Amino acid sequence: MSSRPANNQGPPNLPARDKSLVQRFMAVAKSLQFAWFTGHSVVLISSILYLLKMSEFYYRSAYLGVIESFGIIIYQQFFTRNEPLQTQDAAATKASIKSRVAGLLKSEDVLYLVLANFWLFTPRFSFSLIPFFAFAVFHVLIYVEKVLLPKVFHLSSKDSSKILSFIDKFVVQYNDLCMHWVGTAELLIFILVLFRAILCFQRSWIILVVYAIFIKLRYENSKYMKAAFAQWRVRMDGIISHPSIPPFVKRAYNAIKMSLIRLSEYRLSGAPQVTKKQN
């Protein structure tokens, strides 16, 4: 899943048993990882409130939460782990800058951060919140399980805590499946964006171009998006092959399919890194 907290950026060690609940919470709240968790919590709560009230305030608040959480994880990944540039010689500095830029261009977190900023400053499109809501659900649950409950409430044994056991089983069972759903949802969002452009909604063509680039980059770097495309292709092939489908529709479909296959051969994010696990 995208936007995971860095392992070395967690909150302080477990407070002493004699400290109050407030003191233990404040110790955890001082960490950068807690700010990351807060961002995802804002996304989760704002999305639910937006679904209930359809208020623009909650829509924009959700994307501010996305920007906070993804911005923090990008900061952790690219700006806190490397040797400071000012301590390197010229050649090492140049190589370090190139490495950071290449990493930023291929980062899924950067991609989602850019997209969130785009959705924030364009007309509301409610379906666009679905992937970010899904991310927020699992990130909030993981943080509650790994940090809040054990470090603040001293619930650390899955055998004795039904809450921890439930969260752990839920995340293990549905995390990977949810990422497949996100890939499918993003393709559905693209179809909706395409129809909005055809119907000439406000800024719809700009949104279509930007989201098409997003889908292309996601396809290049995400196994879940590739799986979603493959699933859609199999289903569409079955529908189009039906004898009742007119020949001109079949020809048009095959032409579009072949064009997409050729397009997939061109990478916007550079050569794939085979040694890294895809997200």
UniProtKB/Swiss-Prot annotation:
The chain crosses the membrane at residues 32-52, 57-79, 125-145, 181-201, 204-221. Signal peptide: none annotated. The keyword Ribonucleoprotein does not apply. Keywords: Endoplasmic reticulum, Membrane, mRNA transport, Nuclear pore complex, Nucleus, Protein transport, Translocation, Transmembrane, Transmembrane helix, Transport. Its main location: endoplasmic reticulum. It is found in: Endoplasmic reticulum membrane; Nucleus, Nuclear pore complex. Residues 53-56, 146-180, 222-279 are cytoplasmic. Present with 1680 molecules/cell in log phase SD medium. This is Pore membrane protein of 33 kDa. It comes from Saccharomyces cerevisiae (strain ATCC 204508 / S288c).
